[in-house]
Amino acid sequence: MKCTLRWTITALVLLGICHLARPAYHKKCGRYSYCWIPYDIERDRRDNGGKKCCFCRNAWSPWQCKEDERYEWLRCGHKFYYMCCYTDDDNGNGDGNGNGFNYLKSLYGGYGNGNGEFWEEYIDERYDK
């Protein structure tokens, strides 16, 4: 019994470490799929129909938002997130040349492909190595 309990505790500890060590995770909230980055709150938001891509950062008030950003709050479960978001739509033509992806391109270089994979690749490059 002690041996089984010891292995169970060891497995739970390892599972917890693996859970906390993940670089980013996806969370479904309403009709959007969010990818949270644990160190600085930036996210990629894709609407399945409208190809909307947002770049967001943590904020406490609308006054912290730049001219081309919108202040918004998002509820996930019992938590509320307050953010400044750049919310121009990508035109969804496959080459990522809508305003949303131009904004990401200007920040990080490279080209999007119109469906959010550019931002996913950026996350992979930055956090998975």
From Swiss-Prot:
Q: Does the keyword RNA-binding apply?
A: no
Tissue specificity, per the record, is: Component of conchiolin, the organic matrix of nacre. Expressed at extremely high levels in the dorsal region of the mantle, which region may be responsible for the nacreous layer formation, but only in trace amounts at the mantle edge, which region may be responsible for the prismatic layer formation.
Q: What GO CC terms are in its UniProt record? A: extracellular region
Give the start-end ranges of region 5 X 2 AA tandem repeats of N-G. Answer: 91-100
Ranges for the sequence repeats: 91-92, 93-94, 95-96, 97-98, 99-100
Organism's domain of life?
A: Eukaryota
Signal peptide: which range, if any? 1-23
Q: Where in the cell is it found?
A: Secreted, Extracellular space, Extracellular matrix
Q: Which UniProt keywords apply?
A: Disulfide bond, Extracellular matrix, Repeat, Secreted, Signal
SUBUNIT field = Heterooligomer; disulfide-linked. Pif97, Pif80, N16 and other proteins form a complex.
Instruction: Name the family.
Output: Belongs to the N16 matrix protein family.
Physiological role: May be specifically involved in the formation of the nacreous layer.
Spell out the protein name for this chain: N16.2 matrix protein
Q: Which organism is it from?
A: Pinctada fucata (Akoya pearl oyster)
